[in-house]
Curated annotation (Swiss-Prot):
Gene name of this polypeptide: PAL17.1
Official protein name in the record: Phenylalanine ammonia-lyase
Entry annotation: catalytic residues: 107 (proton donor/acceptor)
Pathway: Phenylpropanoid metabolism; trans-cinnamate biosynthesis; trans-cinnamate from L-phenylalanine: step 1/1
Residues noted as binding (E)-cinnamate in the record, renumbered to the chain: 259, 347, 353, 383, 455, 483, 486
Keyword Lyase tagged: yes
Quaternary state and interactors: Homotetramer.
Subcellular location: Cytoplasm
Length: 715
């Protein structure tokens, strides 16, 4: 049976995720179908797939999560080739040999390359050997401080994607070569590729030529073994268990190895796997931000977002709504807003209130880019293509990596915008003019003059954000005409993927920094609640003792002051006075005195009598408060530090608790103060390392594990 006779039907199956083909000649319906369902469900599927122990390659169903898993090589994942693909691969390889023997003139088989394709030769094998030699044009910078080697994760991703492309049987290469690359992957032998030197059209020629160089035993080829040791080609073959000698490339095989987009699309796959998770993390962190900032949850109401129509926005709002629904912080904030509606603005600032509108389009961009790259890694992207069924070689341009360049430019812009929102939220969080009662810089010490909290961290965040915004600039607009004006437009796909990888790395610095600050804010809210409760109890106790009765035991008019005194404690920001609660220059004592003075003025007739004068009681009240309150506040602090707080931490009753628990308990971080040695950078580093190891994924998804994929019903 002709292996390519049903090519059109196969394309339909591929585009429709393996489902039965339908009338969709332009593939738009399949592209739209792939975007059905929630982004969160898709991320969950990606994580699940990432953790599977085996990747079965057949050319049509490779996913970015599988590429990321093979690239990372931290899950013990192995690659297995589909035997069903062997016949198709062999058919195209045989066709090339037959066509050459029959005198057929084919690009890259009997002709020169690119702008010099007018040249002709009958030495097909020698031509492939020369192709690999002249494309080995990269610089590694060995022996210098400059590292010009492509990260091994990107190389492994490229190897996997290239195998997948060649398995489809349109490229004219032997199956044995694909098996050899698979053995290199499964034995963790990674060829050394140059970091720079490709314009991803005609494919990633220069870096891919170094994989071909290793397979053919070029003396300049190098690989890295499982333990980081440097291997030459012979040692690499032995370590991978490749029994044969080096490959003598047949006609077209060199071109099949180098003329494609897998380095750009492979790295793009790794980048997008992380970008999707970071997008979900940004949604959850925005909800936690609303909690610790005493935000008004009205900004997540479904009607607002339904009227805007954008699915990314609707989902982002629904996820935040789910986390805030039933949150103990939201309930407490509602009571505070009822006590004094004028204490804070009617509406929260944009970084909080419009976070769904901001993040929604970014999620859409990342999701669409993911699907675009997923199509690319399942594409046949070299030239010429061998159509065995029609007995011809098709000369086209599938090596043009524009889907990669455009998707990566767009993703990088989205990543930069996520970082911008994080920085805006972080800036509000550490600023006591905006953070609704938290201390400046989130300082937690007894003496704020010797604790500057997250000040250095805010400077670092500004640095991260600035670099990230610079990286948001497009790469694809900087195309240069190459190769004697034959490659006069080119995608710059790998360059864009590299820059997007840099952007993701920076966002991975910002995210743990921000989450550490949010955990600090959570702890400060807990401390604040306990300190305020102590102040309130102490003021009540002193008021009862000094203001209730007169010198002869009779009820005194000042007994009516207690309720208003406690209102002051409720309204006043605790950290505005708690380092010296009885200071006459701090707002607590000033406003408590003001209450007593106002009651005295309202009690004008009784003020003439020393026995009923409220004014005469002020000194006694203040002196006793000064004696008692500092001791009680210190006692409350000590109890908090010993884990014996009178009031438990509200976070334990919230859906955001799994992230807090992960940061504090699993990673062993703590509330930072100037009284301790540990620095903010140490804590951020712990979380950054854990994020790079993928450890944040499970607690993140646990926060929204109960979400049913829909907004709360309108009522």
């Amino acid at each position: 049976m002709d292996t390519h006779a049903n090519a059109d039907a196969t394309f339909c199956l591929t585009a429709n995720n393996g489902q039965q083909p339908r009338h969709d000649p332009l593939n738009w319906a399949a592209a739209a179908e792939a975007l059905k369902g929630s982004h969160l469900d898709e991320v969950k599927r990606m994580v699940s797939e990432y953790r599977k122990p085996l990747v079965n390659l057949g050319g049509q169903t490779l996913t970015i999560s599988q590429v990321a898993a093979i690239a990372a090589n931290d899950q013990g994942v192995s690659v297995q080739l589909s035997e069903a693909s062997r016949a198709g691969v062999k058919a195209s390889s045989d066709w090339v040999m037959d066509s050459m023997n029959n005198g057929t003139d084919s690009y890259g088989v009997t002709t020169g390359f690119g702008a010099t394709s007018h040249r002709r030769t009958k030495q097909g094998g020698a031509l492939q050997k020369e192709l690999i030699r002249f494309l080995n044009a990269g610089i590694f910078g060995n022996g210098t401080e400059t590292n010009c080697t492509l990260p091994h994760t990107a190389t492994r991703a490229a190897m996997l994607v290239r195998i997948n492309t060649l398995l489809q049987g349109y490229s004219g290469i032997r199956f044995e070569i694909l098996e050899a690359i698979t053995k290199l992957l499964n034995n963790n032998i990674t060829p050394c590729l140059p970091l720079r030197g490709t314009i991803t059209a005609s494919g990633d020629l220069v870096p891919l030529s170094y994989i071909a160089g290793l397979l053919t035993g070029r003396p300049n080829s190098k690989a890295v073994g499982p333990n980081g040791e440097t291997l030459n080609a012979k040692e690499a073959f032995q370590a991978a268990g490749i029994g044969s000698d080096f490959f003598e490339l047949q006609p077209k095989e060199g071109l099949a190895l180098v003329n494609g987009t897998p380095v750009g699309s492979g790295l793009a796959s790794v980048v997008l796997f992380e970008a999707n998770i970071l997008a979900v993390l940004s949604e959850v962190l925005s909800a936690i931000f609303a909690e610790v900032m005493q935000g008004k949850p009205e900004f997540t109401d479904h009607l607002t977002h339904k009227l805007k129509h954008h699915p990314g926005q609707i989902e982002a709002a629904a996820i935040m709504e789910h986390i805030l629904d039933g949150s103990s912080y939201v309930k407490a904030a509602k009571k505070l807003h009822e006590i004094d509606p004028l204490q804070k603005p009617k509406q929260d600032r944009y970084a909080l209130r419009t976070s769904p509108q901001w993040l929604g389009p970014l999620v859409e961009v990342i999701r669409f880019s993911t699907k675009s790259i997923e199509r690319e890694i399942n594409s046949v992207n070299d030239n010429p293509l061998i159509d065995v069924s029609r007995n011809k070689a098709l000369h086209g341009g599938n090596f043009q990596g524009t889907p990669i360049g455009v998707s990566m430019d767009n993703t990088r812009l989205a990543v930069a915008s996520i970082g911008k929102l994080m920085f805006a939220q972080f800036s509000e969080l550490v600023n006591d003019f905006y953070n609704n009662g938290l201390p400046s810089n989130l300082s937690a010490s007894r003496n704020p003059s010797l604790d500057y909290g997250f000040k250095g961290t805010e400077i670092a965040m500004a640095s991260y954000c600035s670099e990230l915004q610079y990286l948001a600039n497009p790469v694809t607009s900087h195309v240069q005409s190459a190769e004697q004006h034959n490659q006069d437009v080119n995608s710059l796909g790998l360059i864009s993927a590299r820059k997007t990888n840099e952007a993701v790395e920076i966002l991975k610095l910002m995210s743990p920094t921000y989450l550490i600050a949010l955990c600090q804010a959570i702890d400060l809210r807990h401390l604040e609640e306990n300190l305020k409760n102590t102040v309130k109890n102490t003021v009540s106790q002193v008021a009862k003792r000094t203001l209730t009765t007169g010198v002869n035991g009779e009820l005194h008019p000042s007994r009516f002051c207690e309720k208003d005194l406690l209102k002051i404690v409720d309204r006043e920001y605790c950290f505005a006075y708690i380092d010296d609660p009885c200071s006459a220059t701090y707002p607590l004592m000033q406003k408590l005195r003001q209450v007593l003075v106002e009651h005295a003025l309202a009690n004008a007739e009784n003020e003439k009598n020393v026995n009923t004068s409220i004014f005469q009681k002020i000194t006694t009240f203040e002196e006793e408060l000064k004696t008692l309150l500092p001791k009680e506040v210190e006692g409350a602090r000590i109890a908090y530090e010993n884990g014996q707080s009178a009031i438990p931490n509200k976070i334990k009753e919230c859906r955001s608790y799994p992230l807090y628990k992960f940061v504090r308990e699993e990673l062993g971080t703590e509330m930072l103060t100037g009284e301790k040695v540990r620095s903010p950078g140490e804590e951020c580093d712990k979380l950054f390392t854990a994020m790079c190891q993928g450890k944040i994924i499970d607690p993140l998804l646990e926060c929204i594990g109960e979400w049913n994929g829909a907004p709360l019903p309108l009522c």
